[in-house]
From Swiss-Prot:
Keywords: 4Fe-4S, Cytoplasm, Disulfide bond, Iron, Iron-sulfur, Metal-binding, Methyltransferase, rRNA processing, S-adenosyl-L-methionine, Transferase, tRNA processing. It is found in: Cytoplasm. Pfam families: Radical_SAM, RlmN_N. The keyword Repressor does not apply. Its EC number is 2.1.1.192. Residues 97-344 form the Radical SAM core domain. PROSITE patterns: RADICAL_SAM (PS51918). This is Dual-specificity RNA methyltransferase RlmN. It comes from Thiobacillus denitrificans (strain ATCC 25259 / T1).
């Protein structure tokens, strides 16, 4: 079976070439052709010896996930559904803004963590994505957007073709990135490599629900910006809505955040907080957050819940959001309220579901629970 070269970072590709008697600079050339030029046909890699091109055609492929469909939101947000085989699909979202282009990347087919307010978690879990499937989302987005006129949220008309449409990557799509640790770290290495996409560590963010041991490993192996899906200010509530908290409670999570900051490219952790009407959006919850995070340099990203069918939750009132935000701001915190982008194409936070052939049994267990 041919080797998919998208599965390699530069070190891995160099080793693979070495096993075939090829010099390291040849690996760098091919790496550049694949990631910077967007070329998948070895015959078009014209500065490479014909004999090597023929060898690659026999032994390798460059294969990103196939696009099943693409949607364009009224606000300029784009969503792709990628086919990753055996009835499974993953979703990837591109959010254009005047000063950046952010790609929201998936790391798993489904998610095993069962956060109760997340559409992905409702779909069950099938498998981890390969490196090629993770990097392939960026590869497709970068090179397909390069061929299109640059569009922003404020100007949907034609413009100059962007040299680098994707300036930021957030691992906030389907799945828990740190539960697919090795593949995610390898993919991050490709994203950061100057021979590939050359993204800054400050512009690549991994989001986790709180897998504490993996947070420590990420700090050692590939410290990028870190976002923690917090969503509750106390263990009793977080145990209910973010079940991984039962394994790694808040005291352990806050300690892991402090350790991560020793290595992080930014001097703060971003705490993501999906606000659920009547559940975690009251003033006392904001005050509990202040007490919880007083020893962790951080900012808060408040996210109004994005409804999906049968979620059981409602979007918070604007007044509740305002009061909550002001309590945090008055305590000296930087607080942002995430704009809802792409909700008309189900591309907003918490709405990504794709297609998941559940192998975990979680969907049927949930159906039986809800029917009881």
């Amino acid at each position: 079976m041919p080797q998919n070269l998208l599965d390699f970072d530069l070190a891995g590709l160099t080793a693979w070439f070495g096993e075939r008697g090829e010099k390291p600079f040849r690996a760098r050339q091919v790496f550049h052709w694949i990631h910077q030029a967007g070329v998948t046909d070895f015959a078009q890699m014209t500065d490479i010896a014909k004999s090597l091109r023929e060898k690659l055609q026999n032994e390798a492929v460059v294969q990103a996930p196939a696009i099943n469909f693409a949607h364009l939101s009224a606000d300029g947000t784009r969503k792709w559904l990628f086919d990753v085989g055996v009835g499974n699909g993953i979703e990837t979202v591109f959010i254009p803004e005047d000063d950046r282009g952010t790609l929201c990347v998936s790391s798993q087919v489904g998610c095993a963590l069962e956060c109760t307010f997340c559409s992905t978690g409702r779909q069950g879990f099938n498998r981890n994505l390969t490196v090629a499937e993770i990097v392939g989302q960026l590869w497709v987005a970068q090179h397909s957007l390069k061929r299109e006129p640059n569009r922003t949220a404020s100007d949907h008309g034609a413009g100059e073709i962007a040299e680098r449409p994707v300036t930021n990557v957030v691992m906030m799509g389907m799945g828990e990135p740190l539960a697919n640790f090795e593949n995610v770290v390898t993919a991050l290495g490709v994203m950061l490599d100057d021979h590939a996409y050359g993204l800054s560590r400050r512009r690549v963010t991994v989001s986790t629900s709180g897998l504490v041991p993996a947070m420590d490993r990420l700090a050692e192996r590939c410290p990028v910006a870190l976002a923690v899906s917090l969503h509750a200010p106390n263990d009793a509530l977080r145990d209910q809505i973010v079940p991984i908290n039962r394994k790694y409670p808040l005291a352990e999570l806050m300690a892991a955040c402090r350790r991560y900051l020793v290595h992080a490219p930014r001097d703060f952790i971003t705490f993501e907080y999906v606000m659920l009407a009547g559940v975690n959006d009251q003033p006392e919850h904001a005050r509990q957050l202040i007490a919880l995070t007083r020893d962790v340099p951080c900012k808060f990203n408040l996210i109004p819940f994005n409804p999906f069918p049968d979620s059981g939750y409602e979007k918070p009132r604007a007044e509740a959001m305002r009061v909550f935000r002001e309590i945090l701001q008055d305590a000296g915190y930087v607080v942002t309220t995430r704009k809802t982008r792409g909700d008309d194409i189900d591309a907003a936070c918490g709405q990504l579901a794709g297609r998941v052939a559940d192998r975990s049994g979680r969907v049927m267990k949930r159906v039986h629970r809800e029917a009881a």
